[in-house]
């Protein structure tokens, strides 16, 4: 029983340490990656190409990805630069 509790504790600890992020992929210029006129699997393929687990086209407008590595830039409302001049 003690080993089982130890195993579960380690499992949750690893889950907290290896935390990935979810969010919208960004295009050049800081805008969300559009999927309006793309094929149905476009977002899943793009997310996988960026080493994410999966993705989908949110409301047929932008690619949303799950479990993205920390090095991938994702769109953030607070730092949004889409359509703004430098």
From Swiss-Prot:
Q: Which domain of life is it from?
A: Eukaryota
- List, for all copies, the residue spans of the domain called LCN-type CS-alpha/beta: 21-83
**Where does the record say this protein resides?**
Secreted
* UniProt-listed GO biological process terms: defense response
Q: In which tissues is it expressed?
A: Expressed by the venom gland.
Kindly state which keywords UniProt assigns to this record, in alphabetical order.
Answer: Amidation, Disulfide bond, Ion channel impairing toxin, Neurotoxin, Secreted, Signal, Toxin, Voltage-gated sodium channel impairing toxin
Matching entries from Gene3D superfamilies are given as: Knottin, scorpion toxin-like (3.30.30.10)
Q: Which residues carry this modification: Cysteine amide?
A: 82
Q: Which InterPro entries match?
A: LCN-type_CS_alpha_beta_dom, Scorpion_toxin-like, Scorpion_toxin-like_sf, Scorpion_toxinL, Scorpion_toxinL/defensin
SUPFAM superfamilies, sorted: Scorpion toxin-like
Lyase in keyword set = no
Where this protein primarily resides, as one coarse class? secreted
Gene Ontology CC: extracellular region
Q: Example GO molecular function term? A: toxin activity
Q: How far does the signal peptide extend, from start to end residue?
A: 1-20
Disulfide connectivity? 31-82, 35-57, 43-63, 47-65
Q: Which family does it belong to?
A: Belongs to the long (4 C-C) scorpion toxin superfamily. Sodium channel inhibitor family. Beta subfamily.
**Role:** Beta toxins bind voltage-independently at site-4 of sodium channels (Nav) and shift the voltage of activation toward more negative potentials thereby affecting sodium channel activation and promoting spontaneous and repetitive firing. This toxin shows moderate inhibition of Nav1.1/SCN1A, Nav1.2/SCN2A, and Nav1.4/SCN4A, and promotes a left voltage shift on these channels. It exhibits similar potency on Nav1.2/SCN2A and Nav1.4/SCN4A (40-50% peak current inhibition at 0.5 uM), and weaker inhibition on Nav1.2 (20-30% peak current inhibition at 0.5 uM).
Q: What is known of its domains?
A: Has the structural arrangement of an alpha-helix connected to antiparallel beta-sheets by disulfide bonds (CS-alpha/beta).
The misc remark on file is:
Shows weak inhibition on Nav1.3/SCN3A, Nav1.5/SCN5A, Nav1.8/SCN8A, and Nav1.7/SCN9A.
Please report the name of this protein according to its UniProt entry. Answer: Beta-toxin To4
